[in-house]
Regions:
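Conserved adenine-nucleotide phosphate-binding loops and their immediately adjacent elements
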Residues: 2-39, 106-110
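Walker A (P-loop) ATP-phosphate-binding motif of ABC ATPase nucleotide-binding domains
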Residues: 47
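Hydrophobic anchor at the beta1->P-loop junction of P-loop NTPases
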Residues: 50
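Conserved phosphate-binding/catalytic loops and adjacent sensor/switch elements of nucleotide-binding enzymes
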Residues: 56, 60-136, 144-146
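Structural recognition of the conserved hydrophobic beta-strand(s) that form the central parallel beta-sheet
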Residues: 138-142, 166-173
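Conserved ATPase-coupling elements of RecA-like P-loop NTPase cores
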Residues: 146-155, 180
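Conserved catalytic/switch belt of AAA+ P-loop NTPases
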Residues: 156-164
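Short regulatory helix/loop adjacent to the ATP-binding pocket of P-loop NTPases
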Residues: 174-182
Length: 182
């Protein structure tokens, strides 16, 4: 019988572990040179939103960008959003994504232990902990349109208050609403 690790009272860690595991890039994937992450148009942007209908290759593009950023020495945290990621679960996913991507198992331990504060305080805690690291982190959030409203509000808050060592790439279908100033 399989066992599962528990994250405080939040439930099993297995589902979160699957959501922070990046997809593989197929070998036969056609490169898109004009969409390289190193392109001048994208290089120094703190936030990049990739928006397109289903099936247009958003996840494949993000997976390629992940490899580019890793090759440049950045820490890449991957999160595949899910409709069940309410704000507490979303924050735990963010913490686990950085812990896994940075190979720092103690990162976000307060959030991972189930002690997620109410409101946006948990996002502030996550941002502060990230700002205190000496890491340049690229956070990739795929399928952000699947997040419930409270988690989307947390993501928008994260985007507006990101520290200088965080770049965020968000992919969503055209119907994703993120309240973020340009």
């Amino acid at each position: 019988m399989a066992s599962s690790v528990s994250l405080g009272s939040a439930g099993p860690a297995d589902d979160l572990a699957l959501k922070v595991t990046p997809p593989r890039v197929p070998r036969h994937l056609v490169g898109r040179p004009r969409l390289l992450a190193s392109d001048e148009r994208y290089r120094d942007r703190p936030v990049i939103l990739v928006q397109a209908p289903a099936g247009f290759g958003k996840t494949s593009l993000l997976a390629q960008w992940r490899l580019e950023h890793l090759a440049q020495g950045a820490v890449v945290a991957w999160l595949s959003a899910h409709p069940q990621h309410d704000r507490p679960r979303f924050l735990q996913s963010l913490a686990l994504a950085v812990a896994v991507g940075a190979a720092r198992p103690t990162f976000g331990h307060t959030l991972l232990d189930g002690a997620v504060p109410p409101g946006l305080e948990g996002v502030t805690i996550w941002l502060a902990e990230l700002a205190q690291t000496a890491l340049d982190v690229v956070l990739i959030v795929d399928e952000a349109d699947r997040l419930p409203t409270d988690a989307r509000e947390a993501l928008a808050y994260l985007l507006r208050n990101a520290p200088p060592n965080l770049r965020t790439i968000v992919a969503a279908r055209a119907d994703c609403a993120l309240d973020v100033d340009d």
